[in-house]
Amino acid sequence: MSMPRQLLLIVCALVLLSAYAVTSKAQSRNVDALTKANQGTIGLVSGPFGSTALNFASDMAEVLDDFENFETRLVVKLGKGTGQNVADLLYLKGTDIAIVQTDVLDHIRRNKIYRNIDGLLRYVTKLHDKEIHLLVASDIADMSDLSGKRVNLGPQQSGSFITGSLLLGLSGIESDIRLDTDAVALRKLLVGEIDAAIIVDGKPSSLLTNLPTDHGLKLLPIENQFMAEKYKSATFDNADYPSFVQEGETIPTLAVETVLAIYNWRPDNKRYPQAAKFINRFFSKFEELQIGTYHPKWESVDIRAEVEGWERFSAADKWLKDNPIKPDAPEVDPLRQQFEAFLEATQPNSNWTPEQKNLLFEQFRAWQKQNNQ
């Protein structure tokens, strides 16, 4: 082989090696980017547009996302209602947690929607309460007027439908049921196409606060004794909805609890460690959600609260047991501090017993009180 041909082959080989190195480096960068984009991701199904659940999910993402170490990234998805959120949690790929109403379990059991639902779902923590808003046209005086009227309950898998259906059923009211979303129902209510809408959402709901001030609608009180056995008492006041409630007045209603639900991953499942990592970060940074400009309902959330009828996810239970509440430090009596400092300064080598110190201090306190009169 001639020298020029050998040189040509060597040059070609070097070019190919260089191209391979560039390609390998580019592929490596792509793999790194793919890994970073997916590691630590937790899929959270929240609530529909305008809901308190969506606000909560957005707050959580802002506080918990970690783009520096890629340990946690919350991917928030708009939900279609509490029943659909359960379906997404069970079957939708990339969904790890969901915000759902606690009464959804009773609804699923009663209607036999899923087998072994108690073994499939767990909760991480109780979240906010969702109040029942019974919005009506101005000519509706009380709930009995809803018989035969056009009442929107929301889509069949929504929390409003689940809770609203129970409310009407226990009240013995048969209405012309509509299944529009809450936002669509409000628009129809404003123009008279329906007579009422039952919306279950945490107060203050932006669905109501964003209405024009001259909306002409009313919030009816809800005081059903049968519902009160299942749900919590609540009220609306002027601070919640200035255009619905006069200063100094309240409107009674009921509320349903919500939880951060999670699929019951077994500890040996590959998703379990990531779920546990998310829970550790969420609980560790929880106090940040109770301050600042986040939704006001965070202030009432107690991550240690038990939820009747639900079982807590094992990783969440472990974190709470490993991080017990520290007892409040006993209140320090300034006078006692001064007394102890005086004894230490004047009699450093004394052998006072605790009982003798206490007796001497009480005599000193009585003497001081007498001299200050």
Segments and roles (model prediction):
Residues T102, K112, I173-K270:
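Pocket-lining segment of extracytoplasmic ligand-binding domains
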Residues Q39-F67, T72, K130-R187, V191:
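Bilobed "Venus flytrap"/periplasmic-binding protein-like clamshell domains
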Residues G40-V45, S51-I97, G248-T250, L360-Q363:
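Extracytoplasmic small-molecule ligand-binding "clamshell" domains
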Residues I10-A19:
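Bacterial N-terminal signal peptides
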Residues E62, V75-N116, L186-K188, P204-L211:
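Pocket-flanking alpha-helical
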Residues R115-L127, F244-I251:
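A structural signal for short loop-to-beta-strand junctions that line the ligand-binding cleft
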Residues S28, Q156-L167, A234-E308:
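Ligand-binding clefts/hinges and TM-proximal coupling segments of bilobed small-molecule sensing domains
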Residues V184, D201-H215, L219, N264, ...:
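An extracytoplasmic/periplasmic, membrane-proximal ligand-sensing/linker region
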